[in-house]
Amino acid sequence: MARYLGPKLKLSRREGTDLFLKSGVRAIDTKCKIDNAPGVHGARRGRLSEYGVQLREKQKVRRMYGVLEKQFRNYYAEAARLKGNTGENLLQLLEGRLDNVVYRMGFGATRAEARQLVSHKAILVNGKVVNVPSFKVAANDVVSIREKAKQQTRIKAALEVAEQREKPTWIEVDAGKMEGTFKRMPERSDLSADINEQLIVELYSK
């Protein structure tokens, strides 16, 4: 399945919530009718079946983290094999992706921009270049900007935007050095309450 390259606001409207696909700190619903689905008849968001609600939640989380359908299924399968709560395991696996960690540290204004930085070899993990967005970041790994990429305007702009966002407690960042430490995996209470991962578990358990 190809990665979606169309308007980002349309995806957020489709899911009825801000997916944080656009840069900036202004809430997305101040820019568009987030409660209305896209299209001419968007205002008529119909009632969904139980399956439809579960599917929408899966699509929302998948799009939020910028993961393709096959990748998402693989993450779910891995989460189900791990001990503990499958839904929480799934969110932790997604949070541990390098592109997401780069975004959380504020080096990218969006997850898509963070993914580009990784793919373009602008990111170091423990001093070594890693250009795989899905790379699993472990506790105490140090993620930093490669020296020759530190002058990129978009990275500096992203760090300015990140200053206005709530800072994750599981990450420590030195903006001056453009370096951060992934201290631990986030707990469920650290993450968005707007995600209902149990719906995704129910969907894949059918």
From Swiss-Prot:
Keyword Lyase appears in the UniProt entry: no
One term under GO cellular component: small ribosomal subunit
Protein species of origin: Vibrio vulnificus (strain YJ016)
Positions of the S4 RNA-binding domain: 96-158
Keyword terms of this UniProt record: Ribonucleoprotein, Ribosomal protein, RNA-binding, rRNA-binding
Oligomeric form and interacting partners: Part of the 30S ribosomal subunit. Contacts protein S5. The interaction surface between S4 and S5 is involved in control of translational fidelity.
Entry protein name: Small ribosomal subunit protein uS4
NCBIfam families reported for this sequence: PRK05327.1, rpsD_bact
Keyword NAD: no
Gene Ontology biological process terms from the UniProt entry: ribosomal small subunit biogenesis; translation
Function, in words: One of the primary rRNA binding proteins, it binds directly to 16S rRNA where it nucleates assembly of the body of the 30S subunit. With S5 and S12 plays an important role in translational accuracy.
Gene that this sequence comes from: rpsD
Family, as annotated: Belongs to the universal ribosomal protein uS4 family.
Alphabetized GO MF terms: rRNA binding; structural constituent of ribosome
InterPro entries named among the record's database cross-references: Ribosomal_uS4 (IPR022801), Ribosomal_uS4_bac-type (IPR005709), Ribosomal_uS4_CS (IPR018079), Ribosomal_uS4_N (IPR001912), S4_RNA-bd (IPR002942), S4_RNA-bd_sf (IPR036986)
